[in-house]
A protein has these predicted regions:
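Bacterial signal peptide processing site
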Residues: 15-18
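His/Asp/Glu-enriched short active-site or ligand-binding loop at hydrolase and phosphoryl-transfer sites
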Residues: 172, 178-214, 247-259
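CE4/NodB-like, metal-dependent polysaccharide N-deacetylase domain
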Residues: 89-102, 124, 141-174, 179, ...
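Post-signal peptide N-terminal segment of mature Sec-exported envelope proteins
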Residues: 22-50
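Active-site beta->alpha N-cap acidic-glycine motif
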Residues: 42-127, 131-139, 147-154
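C-terminal motif of bacterial Sec signal peptides marking the signal peptidase cleavage site
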Residues: 11-13
Length: 271
């Protein structure tokens, strides 16, 4: 579930779950069956083990600190895998930290890109499930667990590090999802500022105006790094410069969590 959206996102109405209409919709039985088959057929490396943490959902940091986290989803979809290197280049050029949530099957197809992302200390990598399903619609808890565990294994095999942060696809979750993530050692991370970059009307100018007008202390912004047609990369330099001009410090989600809960172990990635 998501907190109801209180505003019109760009020019597109939000659903009650807080997601844009263009980003929602349940998969057909055929698509769901294909996702099940993909997950079952994947040759999984050994799954890493993290100590369990208390079930926790984070959607923003402290409101009394002008810190903001830029996050990017690399979604696993039915379409061929994509990677927008311009997003990475914009972040590196601005020396901007970011948290990037990797889909497991996306990571399996984009091996070189995942390794490159992991090579930059300013980037924090998280888990975005293996096949990008609607998790609350999954009746079998073992399938929810498999989506997370399989991605943990994939990222660990490629980077040598195990994510401690988890973002459910489509911003959809229920108490089972948060609990299972905690049992696997991950904090569930949502957001309070959807950029709207998947929307067809989301031009560079609209993305910049929207993010800068809605940014608040502690905000977690969500964008995407897996689609070449989005205007995310074009907007990023102005978004980053605008946030800094307004006095914001860019941080990772892990740093936001540390400020909320000093000493938290559920931050960043584990060896």
């Amino acid at each position: 579930m998501r907190t109801p959206c209180a505003c019109l996102l760009l020019l597109v109405a939000c659903t009650p779950s807080g997601k844009q209409l263009a980003e929602t919709g349940h998969p057909s039985p055929e698509t769901a069956a294909k996702a099940d088959a993909d997950l079952a057929a994947a040759a999984a490396p050994p799954a890493p083990q993290l100590p369990p943490v208390a079930p926790e959902l984070i959607s923003h940091g402290r409101h009394d600190r002008k810190e903001i986290a830029l996050t990017f989803d690399a979604c696993s979809t039915r379409e061929p895998s994509r990677y927008d290197a311009r997003v990475t280049a914009a972040l590196l050029a601005a020396n901007a930290p970011a948290t990037i949530f990797l889909g497991g099957s996306w990571a399996k197809e984009e091996v070189a890109q995942v390794k490159e992302l992991a090579s930059h200390p300013q980037f924090e990598l998280g888990n975005h499930t293996y096949t990008h399903p609607h998790l609350p619609a999954l009746k079998d808890e073992s399938r929810i667990r498999a989506e997370i565990v399989r991605t943990q294994a994939e990222v660990k095999a490629l980077t040598g590090h195990t994510p401690r942060l988890f973002r459910p696809p489509y911003g959809e979750y229920d108490q089972r999802v948060i609990r299972i993530a905690g049992e696997l050692g991950l904090v569930t991370v949502e957001y309070d500022l959807p950029s709207g970059d998947p929307d067809a009307h989301a031009t560079k100018e609209r993305l910049v105006q929207w993010v800068l007008s809605q940014a608040r202390p502690g905000s977690i912004v969500v964008m995407h790094i897996n689609h070449l047609k989005f205007h995310t990369a074009e907007a990023l330099p102005d978004i980053i410069a605008g946030l800094r001009a307004r006095g914001f410090t860019l941080v990772t989600v892990g740093q936001l969590i540390t400020a909320l809960n000093p000493g938290s172990a559920a931050v960043g990635a584990a060896p």
